[in-house]
Design a protein with these regions (language model features):
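Metal-cofactor-binding active-site regions of metalloenzymes
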Residues: 1-208, 216-234, 240-371
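Short HxH-centered metal-ligating active-site micro-motif
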Residues: 213
Length: 371
């Protein structure tokens, strides 16, 4: 199965790109087109490590393929450097939506950290408005091209700063203006969700949806804190939940597992796992199990009934698309179209939308896979 970032792949004779998809874990600053980075940097006089788009892509790859989350995150200094003005944010957001639509995404949630985009003099509110303007322009452009897509914002607070309560209030203020949820991200080690209890208390009081990056670089304690302190409705990555499972026997496709209390809670409550297999490989998130895609516990979690979803994390950093991620999983674990559909249904059910709109997404996915 030929797989590339922007191309297509076929499964059982069907174009994967043509199928309706839901994208829940998609970073705006991880998805800026390299040629856009180069152009915006040139216009703004921003110094880049490489000025040619292809060379810049290679430079980013060197950092993101390191096997360490901390090194992986350094590439974001480049993308955020050209996301500091209203015009820059609007363009990047518009192109992001266009790229999702081209990828066959019908509903997406884009996460980004407003506190990292104030260098051009914008207020937090102005930054959110700029991104929303770009999203709406992208949705309109996609509709003109015959592709219907809806995208909501997830406002991210950085776990190593003290701005989480401020960002939480910002998210709630914009809940009727394009923002659908709150996220906590950044280096996990040393910065547990418990440091941000005031923000999470406020969000709980406001009945506002929360997802938390957890179980990526850190272990099950980070997931425990995301659930207990963050009251997360979804887990950003969450792959380390598999460390709370003990495989006691295997026979063919059958596996016998002993569940820890945390893993059983996540599975039984159908808490969506926002898994991103390419990114997890790049950052070393699957190191406890190995270094190859086939070592990823995705399939184990899926077979055990966890609410697994498939995501890109960072399109530019991982040089990927949702089509590509699905193709990789299908090739690695011998999945068929029924499995691909299940991943989309899990994502639709976990979207930060009213139940009626989630049901509409489920119907769109079901109809799109009725081939």
């Amino acid at each position: 199965m030929p797989i590339d970032q922007y191309g297509d792949a076929r499964l059982d004779g069907v174009s994967l790109r043509s199928l309706p998809k839901i994208s829940l874990h998609d970073h705006l600053d991880g998805a800026v087109r390299p040629d856009t980075i180069a152009e915006l940097a040139d216009d703004a006089g921003v110094a880049l490590p490489e000025t040619d788009a292809d060379d810049l892509t290679d430079w980013i790859a060197e950092r993101t393929d390191s096997g360490k989350l901390t090194e992986y995150l350094t590439a974001f200094d480049v993308t955020t450097s050209v996301m500091q003005t209203r015009e820059q944010l609007t363009r990047v957001a518009r192109e992001f939506v266009e790229d999702l639509a081209e990828d066959g995404v019908i509903y997406g949630e884009v996460r980004w950290a407003p506190e990292q985009h104030l260098g051009g003099g914008l207020s937090l509110e102005e930054a959110v408005e700029a991104v929303q303007e770009g999203i709406e322009e992208g949705e309109d452009a996609a509709a003109d091209a015959g592709r219907d897509i809806r995208v909501g914002q997830l406002l991210t607070a950085m776990r190593h700063t003290d701005q989480s309560l401020r960002i939480a209030r910002l998210a709630v203020d914009f809940r009727d203006r394009g923002v659908v949820g709150f996220d906590l991200a950044g280096a996990e080690d040393g910065f547990p969700p418990s440091r941000h209890r005031k923000a999470f208390d406020y969000l709980t009081e406001q009945f506002f949806p929360v997802t938390v990056h957890a179980g990526e670089a850190a272990g099950i304690d980070s997931i425990r804190s995301a659930l207990l302190d963050g009251r997360a409705l979804r887990l950003g990555h969450g792959v380390r939940v598999a460390q709370d499972l003990e495989v006691v026997a295997r026979s063919g496709d059958t596996v016998e597992v002993t569940f820890g209390d945390l893993a059983r809670w996540v599975r039984d409550r159908e808490i969506p796992l926002e898994l991103s297999v390419s990114s997890n490989l790049q950052t070393g998130a699957i190191a406890p199990w190995g270094e190859e895609l086939q070592d990823h516990p995705f399939d184990l979690l899926y077979q055990l009934g966890f609410a697994v979803t498939v995501n890109v994390d960072n399109r530019t950093m991982s040089r990927t698309s949702l089509t590509r991620e699905l193709a990789i999983l299908a090739e690695t674990f011998d999945y068929g179209l029924d499995d691909i559909e299940r991943f989309q249904l899990n994502a639709a059910a976990g979207a930060f939308l009213p139940v009626e709109e989630r049901e509409e997404l489920i119907d769109l996915v079901t109809d799109g896979f009725d081939l």
